A protein has these predicted regions:
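Beta1/beta-strand and adjacent pyrophosphate-binding region of the FAD-binding site
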Residues: 8-22, 41
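Short beta-strand to alpha-helix junction loop
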Residues: 155-164
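A short, Lys/Arg-enriched amphipathic alpha-helix followed by its capping loop at the start of a domain
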Residues: 14, 26-38, 64
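Glycine-rich FAD pyrophosphate-binding loop
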Residues: 31-53
Length: 164
């Protein structure tokens, strides 16, 4: 049996069924990474409209857009997007509680020991503030502040700002 596919068996056409964000992002990614010898077609229903709930992403969208050579400023402007520093969970744990899961780094490692190890030990002793208090993104979100990460100073806490 021949394990090498013959030219007639080679896939040359790709059909993506379903539009929306997932369909169009898939089509964009495949068209970027596959050679021009592939035909990519997206099929979406005219009967199914836009959901209209707003789109939300996580920080990995920056890597995705970068892989597609999309300029972040232009992307945000043309999509009328905004920046998100984290996700807030209202009534988290019990009514009245809220928790912001800030994107980016939480706390600062001390030597070879990760921050969360110190926090956990202090938390077990009843001496730690809530974990999100150690997130620069959470503080910024609570005070309606935003800036991009300072990438030229890797040891600065401002280098750890994560956003979407």
């Amino acid at each position: 049996m021949n394990a090498v596919p013959v030219e007639a068996d080679r896939v040359s056409e790709i059909v993506i069924v379903g539009g929306g964000t997932a369909g169009w992002m898939t089509a964009a990614a495949l068209s970027k990474v596959l050679s021009r010898s592939y035909s990519i077609r997206l099929v979406e229903s005219e009967e199914i409209g836009t959901v209209g709930v707003g789109e939300a992403t996580i920080p990995m969208i920056k890597l995705f857009n970068s892989a597609l050579d999309l300029d972040e400023n232009q992307f945000v402007r043309e999509t009328m997007g905004s920046f998100k520093l984290g996700i807030e969970f209202v009534n988290w744990g019990q009514l009245g509680d809220s928790y912001i899961h800030g994107f980016g780094k939480i706390g600062q490692d001390l030597g070879l020991v990760p921050f969360y190890q110190y926090w956990l030990k202090m938390h077990q002793a009843g001496k730690a503030a809530p974990l999100d208090d150690y997130s620069i993104n959470t503080h910024a979100a609570r005070h309606n502040r935003f800036m991009r990460a300072v990438t030229d100073r890797p040891n600065s806490p401002l280098a750890a700002i994560g956003y979407d």
